[in-house]
Amino acid sequence: LTCLSAFLLTTTALAQKTYAIITGVSNYEGTANDLTQSTKDAKSLASLYKSKGATVVLLTSQNATRANVIAAIRKVRNIATSNDRIVFSYSGHGMENIICTYASTSSQMLSYNELFRELDQCPAKDIVCYIDACYSGTAANNMHSKNFVSANEKAWKNIMKSNPRYIVYLSSRSSETSSESPLVGSGLMTNGIMKGLRGKADSDGDKNITAIELFKYIHKDVQLHNKRQHSQLVTSKALYNNVLMSW
């Protein structure tokens, strides 16, 4: 009995927890730049992760400010362990090197540099990011090594060797816009993520969705709707078979 109790305690201690920070902005200040799907996308993804037992922080529209996003990451940082998974998701407008969190000027928005600097400090086993925004490929210029070295002049392979925890899905190349579609009812990449994690990406039928399975599904699905949008996966090959979700 004592040995069994010790085994159960050890198993519980080692169980990986998932902490998800899900953000989406449809309604910006004024009405000229509003979107139709981003807030809904964030809520749908948050619901999916909650159904799988994740601890979720959901920030949408006026609550999805730069300050609130950073505060949420820091809160998770204080409770996550080196065995846990952190998920960060953003749906909304994007500019070069910036995700358009709720603000009146770009200087008040969250840069990719800031985002990855905050995530770098989280003690997680792996960090999964979904960024569904125009020009999201520019995130490639803003990731860091463990010592927060700027990645502007480094190849992705060197970045991943330096900090091989990231599994990053970007909705488009650095020069491309990203689409949302009322007909699809979602941003195109987020639509692929939702369908993929719910089982569509399970190419080998083992009920587990791996990082590479999800990417292959997303890329193909987005291309069906928009040939000019190319989703990107940035990760180490060592993480290709990490299970993102079981269904």
Language-model-detected regions and their locations in the chain:
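Cysteine endopeptidase catalytic domains of the caspase/legumain-like
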Residues: 11-247
